[in-house]
Structure formats: structure tokens, C-alpha cells
């Protein structure tokens, strides 16, 4: 995979020490943290959603990869802060600002502060199969057309 290009859209990211280019928290981290590129604290009311900019654009280029914006586990578990779209899928050819839909699913207001780590970005491989229209499948699987709950709970 070639290098992923990152374009700084907001000068705060390079000029303000509270902000920074995204990094991995540890050597074993799969994703990089995305920070809230806001000027002042933002109160997200219980049950509300807000679209928050990151001040960054990312261009993957290689169609065999995509970006995924995922929630941070601590924010979700401790504060009920998750993504409004649950997972953000960023196509390889997208060049606009990375935006994060933040949803406060808790019963209490949440204050998002400038430069707070609010989500994570992971680059993943993408399978790009050809699709063949058929009238019948060539094999019958053990599952067949069994849908929601067909295998039980235990």
C-alpha cells in the first residue's frame, strides 16, 4: 500500500500544541485518534447528534483500501458517546474533510472540548469481487436463507 496523504485544512493543527497531527496511542494501536477541531467547548445534549470537523482531509488513493471512523470505547462505555452513523466508511477516492457524527446516547449532557480525541480512524483492506446475477445458487449452504435469530440464543 502506498502512503496515505493527509492534508491539514485548519492551521490550528500545526500551530496549536493542544492539536496535533493524528498519531497512534501505542505501537500496537490499529487506529489513529481523531480530535475535535472546534474553537470552544461544545455541549452535546442528551440524545442529540452533532457533526464535528477534524480539520483534516485524508486521501487513501488505493481502491483496495478504505478508511473507517470508529467510536472510542472509553467515550462510549463511560459517557454514552458513540457515532451517529455507528461506523463511518471513507472511500479511497474521497478528499474532503473527515467529519465525525457524534451521538450522545446517554441521559446526561456531554461537553466535548477542543482537541479532545473523539473517534479513531482505521485503514482496512477492501475486497472488490465481481458480482454474478444467478437464478439459483450453485451450492446450498448449511444456513441457507435462515435469517435473524435462526440459530437461537444458547
UniProtKB/Swiss-Prot annotation:
Keywords, in A-Z order: Hydrolase, Magnesium, Metal-binding, Nucleotide metabolism
Pathway: Pyrimidine metabolism; dUMP biosynthesis; dUMP from dCTP (dUTP route): step 2/2
EC top class, as a word: hydrolase
One term of GO molecular function: magnesium ion binding
Gene name for this UniProt entry: dut
EC number: 3.6.1.23
Catalytic activity entry: dUTP + H2O = dUMP + diphosphate + H(+)
Pfam families, sorted: dUTPase
Required cofactor names: Mg(2+)
Protein name (record): Deoxyuridine 5'-triphosphate nucleotidohydrolase
Cross-referenced InterPro entries: dUTPase, dUTPase-like, dUTPase-like_sf, dUTPase_trimeric
GO biological process: dUMP biosynthetic process; dUTP catabolic process
Organism: Psychrobacter cryohalolentis (strain ATCC BAA-1226 / DSM 17306 / VKM B-2378 / K5)
Function: This enzyme is involved in nucleotide metabolism: it produces dUMP, the immediate precursor of thymidine nucleotides and it decreases the intracellular concentration of dUTP so that uracil cannot be incorporated into DNA.
Keyword Transmembrane helix: no
Entry similarity comment: Belongs to the dUTPase family.
Record keyword Isomerase present: no
Binding locations of substrate: 72-74, 85, 89-91, 99
CDD domains referenced in this protein's UniProt entry, alphabetically: trimeric_dUTPase (cd07557)
